[in-house]
Swiss-Prot record:
Protein name per the record: Protein png1
Comp. bias regions, Pro residues: 61-86
Signal peptide: none
Native source species: Aspergillus oryzae (strain ATCC 42149 / RIB 40)
Gene: png1
Region of interest called Disordered, as start-end residue ranges on this chain: 30-111, 410-457
Family matches, as SUPFAM superfamilies: Cysteine proteinases
Length: 457
């Protein structure tokens, strides 16, 4: 009888299970696990005996046989030639699980060719956001932005969020500066930049067919074209060729106002910087890029995808599109950060192999870029950025712990039909209601421009 009562009490407790309790327990378990691993590693290094001379000189189980017991030589006198195998590029075992679980990583400089190649790539990519600091470029961008419209929309949205928060006795979800960037996002996607798949024929405006790449012309190279795609008009009577330079220079993007994901993220990030925002340009190794903007109101970095018009939806790519991602590195004028854990919550489901370099090398390169970008800053700014790094690392670890806790909680029988309890793939919240209200008011006043973006990527 007592056993049945005890069993019913346990069942009742499981029904009232709180995910936050499991999250805290999991984080404590991981801290203890890391501590014990470090202790064992230190103990093993302290007590490991050094090999004696006899042990060093004694043959192992795979040592060559003694000459007296060696098989007779082959009848031919030709020297033995070992088989030659083609050289394979060095691959590293994927450290996705250890990276996402926040296990301690000791930074280590790159030693092999593959690690050095990845280090050079990250250093080249880290230069991109430094180009946004050109005062002439920022002034040119500001001259193209309808500031009065953006500030008016931001003020309206900010007041709506404040009223909604006051009605429930809470705090507004976003601050005024966040609303300014959100208004910029709507204008940039709807009125300024155009997505290009196959550029139309400039002679007859008919669709074109891809013909591959072609070398850039000197004029295109001077304007920052990294490569040029060639297209042929689909109309047989026309047959004209259309060139589509892929510009990386933001100056040129202000003139062309068209491109694909790379051009969208590059130009939009610069516009955010022109409005005074702290900006990150995020590179994904699976050929995608986007933007992060720092929210002073929430004291964290917010995901922004100008091409998709997405705001604060970091799980869009992995869980919304089903993409598997390995590296997501954010670059800014203050350094670099590996933000993969923000966009890949479940390494088993959505994580790709991280085998371009050991995790120790990746961490070392990240710190190297930070030191390079911050070496001329004041001690006060360096300390502020260091605290931000610590706060963000805590945030990223919480994402991983919460995702694992939610998966464990979903395994419980009473939660199998309730779905996920953590953050939604496309969060619906108060700011979306405010955005819908603003969009409706713009349609009524004829204020909003057309959306020139095309389908496809």
């Amino acid at each position: 009888m007592a056993d049945s009562i005890h069993h019913s009490q346990r069942a009742q407790g499981s029904n009232n299970f709180d995910v936050s309790e499991l999250t805290n327990a999991f984080e404590q378990l991981m801290r203890n696990k890391r501590f014990h691993r470090l202790q064992e590693h230190s103990r093993a290094r302290t007590h490991s005996p050094s090999p004696s001379p006899s042990q060093v000189s004694s043959p192992g189980p795979y040592a060559p046989p003694h000459p007296s017991r060696a098989p007779p030589p082959p009848p031919t006198a030709a020297p033995f030639q070992p088989p030659q195998y083609p050289q394979q590029p060095q691959q590293y075992p994927s450290n996705q699980s250890s990276m996402l679980q926040g296990l301690p990583i000791v930074p280590s400089p790159p030693q092999d060719q593959a690690s050095l190649k990845f280090r050079n790539l990250l250093h080249v990519l880290s230069v991109t956001p430094t180009k946004y600091e050109n005062p002439g470029l920022l002034d040119e961008a500001l001259s193209l932005i309808p500031l009065d419209r953006l500030y008016s929309e931001a003020e309206e949205e900010s007041q709506i969020l404040q009223a909604q928060a006051a009605s429930v006795g809470g705090r507004p979800e976003w601050g005024y500066q966040d609303c300014v960037i959100r208004s910029l996002l709507r204008w940039f996607k709807g009125s300024f930049f155009q997505f290009v798949n196959n550029p139309p024929c400039s002679r007859c405006f008919r669709p074109t067919i891809a013909q591959g790449n072609t070398p850039p012309l000197p004029d295109e190279t001077a304007r920052g074209a990294t490569r040029v795609e060639l297209y042929r008009c689909s109309e047989m009577s026309c047959g004209a060729y259309e060139r589509f330079p892929r510009y990386s220079d933001v100056w040129q993007l202000l003139q062309s106002r068209r491109g694909r994901v790379g051009e969208w993220a590059n130009c939009f990030s610069m516009f955010c910087r022109a409005l005074g925002g702290r900006v990150r340009w995020v590179w994904n190794s699976e050929d995608y890029v986007w933007t992060e903007i720092y929210s002073e109101h929430q004291r964290r970095w917010v995901h922004v995808d100008a091409c998709e018009g997405a705001w604060d939806q970091p799980r869009l790519y992995a869980e919304g599109w089903g993409r598997k991602m390995s590296y997501c590195i954010a670059f800014s004028i203050d350094g670099a950060t590996d933000v993969t854990r923000r966009y890949v919550r479940s390494s088993a489901k959505h994580g790709a192999a991280r085998n371009r370099a050991p995790e120790e090398v990746v961490h070392w390169v990240i710190l190297e870029i930070r030191r390079k970008r911050r070496e001329n800053l004041s001690k006060t700014d360096q300390k502020r950025l260091m605290k931000e790094d610590e706060r963000e690392e805590k945030e990223l670890r919480h994402y991983t712990a919460s995702a694992l806790a939610a998966e464990l909680n979903n395994l419980l029988p009473q939660n199998q039909t309730t779905g996920r309890l953590d953050e939604q793939k496309t969060p619906v919240s108060r700011q979306e209601a405010a955005a819908e209200w603003l969009a409706a008011s713009q349609r009524n006043s004829g204020h909003s421009g057309p959306d020139h973006s095309q389908g496809g990527r």
